[in-house]
UniProtKB/Swiss-Prot annotation:
Naturally occurring in which organism (per UniProt): Rhizobium rhizogenes (strain K84 / ATCC BAA-868)
Protein name: D-erythrulose-4-phosphate isomerase
Pfam families assigned to the protein according to its UniProt record, in alphabetical order: LacAB_rpiB (PF02502)
Name of the gene this protein is made from: derI
Catalytic activity: D-erythrulose 4-phosphate = D-erythrose 4-phosphate
InterPro entries noted in UniProt: RpiB_LacA_LacB (IPR003500), RpiB_LacA_LacB_sf (IPR036569), SPI_LacAB/RpiB (IPR051812)
GO molecular function, one term: intramolecular oxidoreductase activity, interconverting aldoses and ketoses
Keyword Hydrolase in annotation: no
Domain of life of the source: Bacteria
């Protein structure tokens, strides 16, 4: 699995910890940008990573900022992306199993490194069942996405 991990200036440290934690099991690209300027803004970082998921550069991604909220909102602006803010393992599991999320986000100022590792592991260990109970909900999400992005 090709996995992107990125953090802004508040999330870069945790992003690097996660990349190191996962690099032996996944094809990890740690793509944080913390230099000054627009490339380091969390919105632009999330856009680059989410666009990479859509174009197939990455299969899944983990984005980190101070709270996880900014990168989540930003990633979800990219058509076709389902990014979920996760600060516990149950939400991470459900993001994969119930929502077919391609991206999870988390806040470096909200959770510690060991919990972040457990969240990443929980998300990446789960696969969406396209014939499961949640398939209709995910299809409906995709239809809403298509409706507004067709304008």
């Amino acid at each position: 699995m090709k996995l992107a991990i990125a953090g802004d200036s508040a999330g870069e440290g945790l992003a690097k910890v996660l990349a190191d934690h996962l690099k032996d099991r996944y094809d990890v690209s740690e793509v944080s940008r913390t230099d000054a300027g627009p490339d380091a803004f969390y919105a632009n970082l999330a856009d680059r990573v989410a666009s990479g998921v859509i174009d197939g550069t990455y299969d899944k991604a983990i984005l980190v900022c101070g709270t996880g909220i900014g990168v989540s909102i930003s990633a979800n602006k990219v058509p076709g992306i389902r990014a979920a803010l996760t600060h516990d393992t149950y939400s991470a599991e459900r993001a994969a199993l119930s929502n077919n999320a391609q991206i999870i986000t988390m806040g470096a100022r909200v959770i510690g490194t060991e919990l972040a590792k457990a969240i990443a592991d929980a998300f990446l260990a789960r696969t969406f069942d396209t014939n499961g109970r949640s398939a209709g909900n995910v299809q409906a999400i995709d239809e809403v996405d298509a409706k507004y992005n067709a304008r």
